[in-house]
Amino acid sequence: MASSDKPLHILDIALQGGGAHGAFTWGVLDGLLQEPRLAVGAVSGASAGAMNAAVLVSGLVSGGREGARERLRSFWKELNKSGREAGPLIPMIEAFPETTRAMSSWWTTMFGDLGMAHGSPEMGREMQDILRKVIEEHVDFAAIASDKAPPLFISATNAQSGTARIFRKDDLTTEALLASACLPLYFPPVTIDGKDYWDGGYSANPPLVPLVLESANDDLLLITVNPQARDQTPRNAAGIVDRITEIGFNQSMRKEMQGLFLLQSSIGRTRAKEGLIAQVERMRFHEIHDEETLAAMPAQSKMLPVRQLLLTLRDAGEAAARRWCEASIESLGKESTVDLASRFGPG
């Protein structure tokens, strides 16, 4: 990587959610933070992406690049530690690695489909409280709200209206982050200002339009976790539920990206170029993903922050970031490095 200490390119970063698979995003961020030619601009996130985003910004404000790297490492380490202390399942999997390879069939046998792991979402309140403690230990909301912090956009889904609420620097709280990561079959809704919220992945995964409209930067990097495509159609109930969930969590991003692609494609025929149209015209889009690695992970592992899983995904994310930097960094400020038509276009 470059030896210069002067950042040459400012990247806005949008972080998709994916439970424990968000450790891949941790690795990507760690790799990007080691690249001196890059600087972090505005950040958005949903669910696990929201956690990564808030921890990243907290670390950047308090300790710069190395502070952000250390805070992300500590956050994911504490998630694993808290998961091990909460019950016997994660210690069992870590003690018997072969269990992980059979995790999908074992989980289905014991609990049924992914969404039926709990008889009632209220049973997840204890885990919600554990996550609250981890957030409070790693996210500095005063730092996030300060003038030193980059813009931050976090999504949660209004459980009644189905619309996205976007939390910004000045109104972000622990409860907002919990809401962004509230899978309704596992956890009770998070109530904020008298309204109930579910996972932000249902409505803005991750938030993109705020980055386009409210940031002055022209390069937007998506870090995606959920595979867009699968080689085969699932035939059993558990596989079908998993794929439906995957499609659902990708849908909001696909629709936003399709809209931006169609708008950008038609700009040449538009005379009045103001507001969103003017902003979209100048945008350059990029993406880091590793569909092969993430598609091989059982869907149930998203709910299990097993140490080896987290480290494997972290390493895969860092490697993906390095590959992207080597291939694409010279294109920043010049052109998009993701083909929006083939990646997100209709069809």
Functional labels for PLM-detected ranges:
Residues K6-A14, G19-D129, K133-I135, D171-A179, ...:
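Patatin-like phospholipase
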Residues G67-S74, P91, E330-P346:
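Charge-dense, low-complexity polyampholytic segments
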Residues G27-D30, S58, R168-D170, L211-L213, ...:
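Short, glycine/charged-enriched secondary-structure capping and boundary segments
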Residues S265-G275:
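A short, acidic, amphipathic alpha-helical segment used as a generic capping/interface helix at domain edges
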Residues M1-L11, A149, A159:
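Small-residue-rich anion-binding loops in enzyme active sites
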Residues P234-S266:
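Acidic, Ser/Thr-rich peripheral helices and adjacent loops at domain boundaries
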Residues V43-S44, L222-T224:
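Short internal beta-strands
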